[in-house]
Amino acid sequence: MSESLIAIVPAAGIGARASLPGEAAVPKQYRPLAGQPMLRHAVRALLADPRIVQVRVAVSAGDGWVEQALAGLPRTVWRPCGGPNRADTVAAALADSGAAADDWILVHDAARPGLPAAALARLIDACLDDAVGGLLALPVADTVKAGRQRVSRTVDRDGLWLAQTPQMFRAGLLRDALARARAAGLAVTDEASAVEAAGHAPRLVAGALRNFKVTWPDDFELMEKWL
């Protein structure tokens, strides 16, 4: 395989929803889980597959936690490329990586420390021969309701999936998709959204329950049990 596999972890946010009122303002990705920062777990999960040649962590300028959080991890670098939103952070990290157009980029949430090695391998295996690339996802199992304080309707869950990460695309395709989305003023919440907006159909690859995104305060206790 001539193309390299490079992982990008956007870690420039603060994760305010994960904090309880009055808690110290330690960014979510640096809060401890099973004795280690959550970000370290997420990066180690990516390093479990030797086909990933490097993990690049994008942090905010002046980040005072990352060096200690990731000390000693192989094939890992961190760079102050954090932007005002996820898409800008990923685009900056991609530009900083020096990746060739045909290299594969795997973007993974810092708040998904429970990524199983089998799910990561499944994604890579499925995407290496795919013309577009893809993402880990889970079919929606629960009944879905739309509404604010009251239900306005029940949404047909047939064909609905919950997007996870990593999301894996060629560097050239992803770079172009993110640039197009920005030029069009599209608010994309993940890389697949940008790729879809560029006219492509990413592949859906079975994810894992334990690969959920740590978002709310109670999620830390649940993830501790997985780790």
From Swiss-Prot:
InterPro entries: IspD, IspD/TarI, IspD/TarI_cytidylyltransf_bact, ISPD_synthase_CS, Nucleotide-diphossugar_trans. It holds the Pfam family IspD. The keyword Phosphoprotein does not apply. It catalyses: 2-C-methyl-D-erythritol 4-phosphate + CTP + H(+) = 4-CDP-2-C-methyl-D-erythritol + diphosphate. Pathway: Isoprenoid biosynthesis; isopentenyl diphosphate biosynthesis via DXP pathway; isopentenyl diphosphate from 1-deoxy-D-xylulose 5-phosphate: step 2/6. GO terms for molecular function: 2-C-methyl-D-erythritol 4-phosphate cytidylyltransferase activity. Keywords: Isoprene biosynthesis, Nucleotidyltransferase, Transferase. One of its GO terms (biological process) is isopentenyl diphosphate biosynthetic process, methylerythritol 4-phosphate pathway. Its EC number is 2.7.7.60. Catalyzes the formation of 4-diphosphocytidyl-2-C-methyl-D-erythritol from CTP and 2-C-methyl-D-erythritol 4-phosphate (MEP). Belongs to the IspD/TarI cytidylyltransferase family. IspD subfamily. This is 2-C-methyl-D-erythritol 4-phosphate cytidylyltransferase. It comes from Bordetella pertussis (strain Tohama I / ATCC BAA-589 / NCTC 13251).
